[in-house]
Swiss-Prot record:
One of its GO terms (molecular function) is RNA binding. Residues 1-72, 110-183 form the RRM domain. Residues 185-250, 322-344 have a biased composition (Basic residues). PROSITE patterns: RRM (PS50102). This is Serine/arginine-rich splicing factor 6. Extensively phosphorylated on serine residues in the RS domain. Phosphorylated by DYRK1A, probably in the RS domain. Phosphorylation by DYRK1A modulates alternative splice site selection and inhibits the expression of MAPT/Tau exon 10.
Length: 344
């Protein structure tokens, strides 16, 4: 017997309301109400066709209902399904009948784009309308673009059937256009692939950046350590060099001072000798007094300049000998002169 599906029913609808709604379209054999939908069995198939054609989109208890031909074998309220005309039958649970059809949405790859959709048509209307071609798992309307919807089917055959039979049909006064959504699936796949690649690239970049940072830090630390070591070595070397140069320069200065003092003492000694020899013993007493004073003044003037204590010690012995010798000679000369004057 022909059966008709009624969708988007109000939860307050009763069986009497359904009978009134279908009155005038033949005799009703059975009315089966579910949560939000139901089934009506007609006695004549022509009455069922007329009801589907004229009552689809009409209001019932404040809700715009969908009326369409039911698909699949009939199932009773206990879950038993009766076979078709060829016979046969079996048991099917309610999960596979009602809850599977009208359960939570499931995304699949068998997707159709619905264009030229009426603004009055909601996603529930679109889903209920597309059920006549096959099992609809997901429906959406006016989400991404206005007057455009999305329908996803359980299998490829259901999608192909909807594309062949329902393309160009009228929903709420508009002829819809169905387009198979092939590029979007590939685009989404490539997008997910690019996402995973970009994430892996970001992770690898962050790891490489972290490794480069740690390497640069370790290199900078090793450089700073090597610099500090080189600085310490250079400082120790410079200190050693300074101490060596000081120790070397001190003996040089001492040697130079010794040599200078020796040369000065020798020169002064020779000068005093030559001056004392150049004076003649035949001069008068005045000349002797002058020569004594000159020799003393010259010896005093020729005596070395005041020198630091280290230099004075090294220079002092030779000039004392020279002055003592010159004084002794001058005294001997003065004695000899005084003797000669007394004899005269």
């Amino acid at each position: 017997m022909p059966r008709v599906y009624i969708g988007r029913l109000s939860y307050n609808v009763r069986e009497k309301d359904i009978q009134r709604f279908f009155s005038g379209y033949g005799r009703l054999l059975e009315v089966d109400l579910k949560n939000g939908y139901g089934f009506v069995e007609f006695e004549d198939s022509r009455d069922a066709d007329d009801a589907v054609y004229e009552l689809n989109g009409k209001e019932l208890c404040g809700e715009r209902v969908i009326v369409e031909h039911a698909r699949g074998p009939r199932r009773d309220r206990d879950g038993y399904s009766y076979g078709s005309r060829s016979g046969g039958g079996g048991y099917s649970s309610r999960r596979t009948s009602g809850r599977d059809k009208y359960g939570p949405p499931v995304r699949t790859e068998y997707r159709l784009i619905v264009e030229n959709l009426s603004s009055r048509c909601s996603w529930q209307d679109l889903k209920d309308f597309m059920r006549q071609a096959g099992e609809v798992t997901y429906a959406d309307a006016h989400k991404e673009r206005t007057n455009e919807g999305v329908i996803e089917f359980r299998s490829y055959s259901d999608m192909k059937r909807a594309l062949d039979k329902l393309d160009g049909t009228e929903i709420n006064g508009r002829n819809i256009r169905l387009i198979e959504d092939k590029p979007r699936t590939s685009h989404r796949r490539s997008y997910s692939g690019s996402r995973s690649r970009s994430r892996s690239r970001r992770r690898s970049r962050s790891r490489s950046r972290r490794s480069s940072r740690s390497r640069s830090r370790s290199i900078s630390k090793s450089r700073s350590r090597s610099r500090s070591r080189s600085k310490g070595r250079s400082r120790s070397r410079s200190k050693g060099r300074k101490s060596r140069s000081k120790s070397k320069s001190k003996p040089k200065s001492d040697r130079g001072s010794h040599s200078h003092s020796r040369s000065r003492s020798k020169d002064e000694y020779e000068k005093s000798r030559s001056r004392s020899r150049s004076r003649s013993p035949k001069e008068n007493g005045k000349g002797d007094i002058k020569s004594k004073s000159r020799s003393r003044s010259q010896s005093r003037s020729n005596s070395p300049l005041p020198v630091p204590p280290s230099k004075a010690r090294s220079v002092s012995p030779p000039p004392k000998r020279a002055t003592s010798r010159s004084r002794s000679r001058s005294r001997s000369k003065s004695r000899s002169r005084s003797r000669s004057s007394s004899r005269d």
